[in-house]
């Protein structure tokens, strides 16, 4: 409450704050983004039957403040079924076919349930909607389209859509890391290294959209270590492996990888700094 009172202003209409949608086993953030449900009651109304959001109905301009120090942790019930989401989203889009927000959520839900072609079709339509201008959400649509193309066996199109996602929002790690994970599966080591190098240059999380936990944990350096190893760049592989282990020091696979890379470096005369 004190954090809210410290930043609230008389003309403020909404308060934004950090939201941890998921937490890792050690309590650190998994999926994290900025949330928005603190508001002046008279100026907003709830909209949509699922993934509800606040629709502004005031006469003046919105004024949002960010509440530093306020964090909401979400503890999802792993036993809870998502079966109700899809029909509600289909109903929402049927009622408002031009609603870009619901169209995006519907396409994403098709991905979650493995209906890949419907995901592709729906999210391509999302990208064509005149109100679908938010770069981060457009980027997310492109990422899910890419993922869906991979699952139906068209990796050429998956690559194309990941490149489009990066071009849409080059300052977020997520499209680079997800693309790198696909390239890893295909043993495309030079592409993995290129993407990881670019991703690690991004030092700040987005304050405007979802940040996936795997973009900010050991994953980038882990992928970098493996790619460099197979490219014969052993000293650089060692550096990435050491960094990966600092994020997850108890991970046995990362420990074994580091030992393997160290041994290779010793074998060819590279000393560890």
Model regions and ranges:
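Catalytic-site signature of metal-activated, phosphate-bearing donor transferases
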Residues: 1-121, 125
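TPR-repeat structural position
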Residues: 82, 116-117, 155, 189, ...
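Structural signature of alpha-solenoid helical repeat junctions
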Residues: 98, 137, 171, 209-216, ...
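"A position-specific structural signal for the A-helix of alpha-solenoid helical repeats
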Residues: 105, 144, 178-181, 185, ...
């Amino acid at each position: 409450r004190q954090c809210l009172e410290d930043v609230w202003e008389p003309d403020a209409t909404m308060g934004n704050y950090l939201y941890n949608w998921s937490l890792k086993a050690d309590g650190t953030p998994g999926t994290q983004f900025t949330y928005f449900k603190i508001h002046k009651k008279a100026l907003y109304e709830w909209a949509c039957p699922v993934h509800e959001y606040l629709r502004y109905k005031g006469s003046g301009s919105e004024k949002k403040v960010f509440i530093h120090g306020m964090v909401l942790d979400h503890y999802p019930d792993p036993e809870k079924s998502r079966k109700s989401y899809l029909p509600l989203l289909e109903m929402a889009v049927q009622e408002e076919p031009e609603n870009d927000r619901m169209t995006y959520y519907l396409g994403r839900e098709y991905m979650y349930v493995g209906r890949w072609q419907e995901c592709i079709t729906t999210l391509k339509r999302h990208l064509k909607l005149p109100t679908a201008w938010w770069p981060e959400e457009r980027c997310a649509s492109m990422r899910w389209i890419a993922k869906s193309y991979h699952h139906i066996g068209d990796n050429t199109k998956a690559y194309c859509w990941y490149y489009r996602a990066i071009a849409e929002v080059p300052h977020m790690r997520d499209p680079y890391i997800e693309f790198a994970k696909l390239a890893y599966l295909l043993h495309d080591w030079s592409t993995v290294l290129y993407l990881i190098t670019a991703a690690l240059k991004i030092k700040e999380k987005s304050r405007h959209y979802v940040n996936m936990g795997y973009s900010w944990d050991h994953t980038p350096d882990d992928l970098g270590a493996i790619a460099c190893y197979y490219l014969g760049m052993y000293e650089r592989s060692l550096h990435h492996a050491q960094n990966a282990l600092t994020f997850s020091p108890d991970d046995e696979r990362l420990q074994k990888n580091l030992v393997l890379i160290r041994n290779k470096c010793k074998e060819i005369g590279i000393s560890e700094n």
